[in-house]
Amino acid sequence: MTIAVAVKRLAHGAGLPLPDYATAGSAGLDLLAAVDAPVVIAPGARALVPTGLAIALPPDFELQVRPRSGLALKHGIVIPNSPGTIDSDYRGEIQVIVLNAGTEAFEVTRGMRIAQAVLAPVSRLVWQETDDLDRTAREAGGFGSTGLDFPMGN
């Protein structure tokens, strides 16, 4: 399935290709850094990386901004609010919050594939207030209450 999305290239994004899928089976498009000069992110520091793009999503869709696994594994570069959500009514520039969780400074350069974006449908809920909820085996257990080990059946 393909969905048409209007995209506006901002002045500082000129000369960069539009985000694209790296392979035919890729779920995410690679977002490129539209920085004019290299941005050095120290260990433990964050930076807001521009993409040089603004979009108009169709209603009932969002664009999820996610980390790239290679950057996370090799350099400790993560997106702390992952997945970041670009709402269908947002028209500003797509920017990526990047955190260096690694041990060495990381340099973001122009055109670097800094994150990936996945188009996703959005369902809207309608609250149905009640005095009673159905019972479950788990009940209110959370925050690790199911343990770390996978239960092995006999």
UniProtKB/Swiss-Prot annotation:
It catalyses: dUTP + H2O = dUMP + diphosphate + H(+). Its EC number is 3.6.1.23. This is Deoxyuridine 5'-triphosphate nucleotidohydrolase. One of its GO terms (biological process) is dUTP catabolic process. Gene3D superfamilies: 2.70.40.10. Belongs to the dUTPase family. It holds the Pfam family dUTPase. GO terms for molecular function: dUTP diphosphatase activity; magnesium ion binding. Keywords: Hydrolase, Magnesium, Metal-binding, Nucleotide metabolism. PANTHER family: DEOXYURIDINE 5'-TRIPHOSPHATE NUCLEOTIDOHYDROLASE. Its cofactor is Mg(2+). Substrate binds at R68, S69, G70, N81, T85, I86, D87. It comes from Acidiphilium cryptum (strain JF-5). InterPro entries: dUTPase, dUTPase-like, dUTPase-like_sf, dUTPase_trimeric. Pathway: Pyrimidine metabolism; dUMP biosynthesis; dUMP from dCTP (dUTP route): step 2/2. This enzyme is involved in nucleotide metabolism: it produces dUMP, the immediate precursor of thymidine nucleotides and it decreases the intracellular concentration of dUTP so that uracil cannot be incorporated into DNA.
